[in-house]
Amino acid sequence: MKIAILGVENSHADAFGELIKLNPEEYGDIEIVGIYSEEEDAVKRITDKGYATYAASSPDEFLGKVDGVVVTARHGDNHYKYAMPYVKAGVPCFIDKPFCANVENAKELARTAEENGALLCGGSCLKFIDEIKPLARMAKTKKVKTGTVACPVNMNNIYGGFWFYSQHLIEILLTIYGKNVKSVTAFCPDNTKNRITVIFNFGEFDVCGFYTDSYRYTASLMTADNNIYQAYCDDVVYTFKNEFDEFVQMVKSGVMPCDYDDLVYPVKLLDAIERSYTQKKEIFIE
């Protein structure tokens, strides 16, 4: 199985390269034929570690040469740009968070993938964290009264501002409570600070989302019988293997682990949050 990694700026590229290099008994049939990045330092980091030996001069250079593509660019705008040529060619793609940096690109990428039979997976790896599994089980088996999710955000960066890190909270939220958000109301007192509060209206209950500058991931759920369930996680590195294994299984089996809309839906919520705190009003989810 031959793959290429496009956009090797973030830690996911290192994690995937390390998994392949250090675990030949599990990934011996997988070869990284090359990488691409607009940042020379990122290319040097990956090649110096021996994860890849070839760096392409353009992101579409691996067309016709790979069985799958991994897109891990830091800027979400590049996810659409890097993945689209491969999607049009029907090549399976893993696309890191955010899936895309705007709703129209996300819809178009998913629609093109479906039309061309290109399998897709990706998004935030935090949907795999073990600590939220009991909460997801409670949300499915008991009546929910309310809940919270808290995750870090980075508002001041060159990789899309709010969009850069915000999908993690969304995917924890959706893993626990499902895709049934009716509306969002978001508050951002100061765009220069890492602080946003969001009310996710699920119809019969609300969940409060807290974006902060603390690199901890927490969630809580209160059921109708007033029992409270909590999750706390500060070690998420192991989830890189979960998402890479999901991609490998998808390519080998020819079966997507999710629907195309599952990849677009978090982008819709992120767009709604940004519009809500910018326009200072409740945004309904279509």
Task: Label every model-predicted segment.
Residues 48-110:
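Beta-loop-alpha module in the N-terminal Rossmann-like domain of NAD(P)-dependent dehydrogenases
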Residues 1-50, 141, 258:
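N-terminal Rossmann-like dinucleotide-binding module
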Residues 100-159:
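A contiguous active-site-proximal alpha/beta segment in oxidoreductase catalytic domains
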